[in-house]
């Protein structure tokens, strides 16, 4: 099986974390699994759930680390090592507090903005130069709300609807990303604007 790259969505395993803001990475992978009719592989030795598709993303694995968010690197690192994946062909999808819901950013490298999943991956890989798809969750409209409570809080129906409207653009951009047309993918994601902004207050 020839594997060129990995698309990993970050989140926390367990039903209690489904549809929480911190699990947006998992949600994107779940959508890709459905769209591409991906088949599940054994990822136990990597502490990951893994899928392979024979459609448009046929040379990339879809991965969901099962280590909990703050230890994501302990799953990503052995997976990258086993398949000999370069930093240019690793894409990590995660939630982003510093972007409003409905906005996305695709970039290579950069900081962590305090995201513990990214910190763990950078620590374990020894590089920050992999690609990230940052999906905005915004910050709580309540100044007194703890950040941890916010990211572990469940998405509202309005937020879920907004996220669903992102998926067509994400899928189209990924179709360019895997063909090494990464600048095209970056332009598609970074220029995307919803017709209606979402007010969480």
Swiss-Prot record:
It is found in: Cytoplasm. InterPro entries: Pept_tRNA_hydro, Pept_tRNA_hydro_CS, Pept_tRNA_hydro_sf. It is an enzyme of class 3 (hydrolase). Keywords: Cytoplasm, Hydrolase, RNA-binding, tRNA-binding. Its main location: cytoplasm. One of its GO terms (cellular component) is cytoplasm. The active site is at 22 (proton acceptor). It comes from the Bacteria. The record marks 12 as: Discriminates between blocked and unblocked aminoacyl-tRNA. It catalyses: an N-acyl-L-alpha-aminoacyl-tRNA + H2O = an N-acyl-L-amino acid + a tRNA + H(+). Its EC number is 3.1.1.29. Pfam families: Pept_tRNA_hydro. Monomer. This is Peptidyl-tRNA hydrolase. The lineage of its organism: Bacteria, Pseudomonadati, Thermodesulfobacteriota, Desulfovibrionia, Desulfovibrionales.
